Amino acid sequence: HTSTGVSKKNGFKHLKAGQTPAKLNSIDQEIFLEEKLKPVLKEATDNKRHVFFMDASHFVMSAFLGYLWCLTRIFIKAPSGRQRYNVLGALHAVTHQVVTFTNDQYINSYSVVELLKQIALEFTDLPITIVLDNAKYQRNAFVMGEASKLKIDLLFLPTYSPNLNLIERLWKFVKSECLYSKHYEKFPEFKTAINTCLSDTTNKHKEKLSTLLTHNFQLFNKTS
């Protein structure tokens, strides 16, 4: 018997190892999930509140290499330069609509406030909660003050909790859908591909995202 055969016979599976944030506090995460996140998500599913998950992703125009079914190995042409496209996004927890603020420089507190203003202007019918991490450009007096003026509740995640931020799954989806194993000759084409993918979350990608963006959150209580 081969080692592979013996392993399969004994119930072993060939799985890629996962990783967890080094400094996460599983107890804090569990309390947050049960006492804060689940209640607002229940309001969202009952159409009593708009809940968004906010985060920034910095897409660098480089070769995104993935796995392909092919007869011979395929090589993807690498673009010249390292231009970066910054997307500050807010993912609606129920409809999966994405509201974005984008630029080619950097994301800061003013970017966050601009996105909050967009959301407040568009979603006027229900209370609004934004779930976000503790990045300095998000958790500060300026942003919190502006959010208060806009009557937006900011719900900050426990530290080191990307697993509780739904939009993190969307960023991985975008890379898989329009960046992995694809070559874009020019930076505008690269940006357009990302923008198009994000604008199609409620139509073209609706079926795929309905299973990816469920309100089931993995907690890491049993890691080695």
Regions found by a protein language model. Name each.
Residues 1-224:
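Short functional hotspots at interaction and active-site rims
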